[in-house]
Structure formats: C-alpha cells, structure tokens
Amino acid sequence: TCALPICMEKSPLLSKWASSQRAFLWNDKAVESDSLLGNGRKDLGCEDAFVLYTNPMDDLFRIVEANPSDGKAMEYALSYLLLAKDMDNVVGFVEKYFGAPALKTLPTPVQECLLFYSDYYATMDVKFAVSHGMPQEDVERRQAYDLDWIIAHGVTEENLARFKSFKEKYGKAAQSRNPKSAMASFRETFWYYLLFTQISDN
C-alpha cells in the first residue's frame, strides 16, 4: 500500500497535483501553515459527528465553534439564517461571534437584519403582544437588542440612514395598491426579502 498522493503520482491527469501534495505527507507543520489545509484542520471538531446527520446548520455551527477564523463557514451560517428569515438566531449568532477573527465587521444584509429586528421590537406594544400570546419576558428580552446594542455590534451609521429611508418609503408604499412594486429600489436588501419574498416549502 502507499499514501494516496504517492499512488496518484502515477496518474497522467493527477500526477502534478499529487506531487505538489507530497510535501504535506506526515508533516503537521506544513499542513498547519498552508492557508487551505491549515484552516480545514482547525475546522475539525473535538468530537466525531456525522455530516448532515440533522441539518446543515449543525455542521456549520460545529465548524464555527471550532474555528472562529473560518470566514466561509461564518458567511454560510449567516446566509442560511438570513434566507430562513431566522432573525432571532441571526441576533444570537452576532451576539456570540461578533469580534471573532472572521466577523470583525458585519455584512450589509446582517446589519439590515439587526436594524429591522431592533426597530420591530422597540416599537412593539408589550401589552398588545402579551394579549396575543407572546410572553412578556420574551418581548422584553428582544427589546434589549436596542439601537445602542446593534451599533455596538457592527451596524454603521450609513446603514442606519438607509433604514430610516426605507421606513419612510415603506410607510408611503403601504398605502399604495402595489407596495412591492413601490419598494423596488430596495429589492436588493434583506428588508425587501423579509417583507415581500415567500419561502417555498419545496
């Protein structure tokens, strides 16, 4: 038997690639210093687990937990949550990982999510929410993620100004016959996606 890269050196199509990988055989230092392989090794969790045993988020969270410097894992995890419109978990993710090596700044869609979330609960009538079945402690817990909190966690003044513009325009558009069309200039935002795009069950 032989190590895979050595065996693959005999392949006409893969010989060059296999030869380039020979340097990593039985050489932990070389693996760890390589940008791709080193990052992949850091992604390995402390315990064995089946990939996709439950859902992709479980795998992504394990990777992010093991290696907070993995920018791709951070992006995939946040993208998954945003596409699912799971704002509670976006906020929780930012609360836990903002400031980590791969999350020194927040992507614009994540900032847009925090802005909407903070504003939504800040303006919520607690008594009305409780009367419709939402526990008061849940409302108050979400209201703790106020404007000061989201600014401290990466929301910029520029995006705050954009959100104010969005709210003003949406207030007018909501009175029109076709609010979706009236808000077309915000089509590329999380706000538009949240309000006007339905998630398919298929």
Residue ranges and their predicted role:
Residues 79-82:
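Residue at a conserved register position within TPR or TPR-like alpha-solenoid repeats
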Residues 18-24, 40-63:
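Repeat-mediated protein-protein interaction surfaces in helical alpha-solenoids
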